Amino acid sequence: EMATKLVAARLLTAEAARAKESGQRADMLSGMAKLFASETAKEVCEDALRIHGGYGYINEFMVERLYREAPLYIVGEGTNDIQKIVIARRIIDDSEVDVLGLPQ
């Protein structure tokens, strides 16, 4: 489950980068990638800490640092609440955006 979430976060980030590099508007995809990847990082770090048990809190284990730093990704470069607003505005304002792949 943890690996699946991490791969999905990487793929979404790569798709946002591909859109940006090809000159397409990438604000929505970038916001989605940041939102999903930062939430995933926090969830995966929490799971890793549980797996390590008490050792997860010891500075000698990398999971302690990752667990401590993961919430910072949610705040950096615009909080996830701001990312949700960016995504929603793009979907509402642009009729060309077809997020679900449904006929319009």
What do the predicted segments below correspond to?
Residues 1-104:
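Alpha-helical interface subdomain recognition
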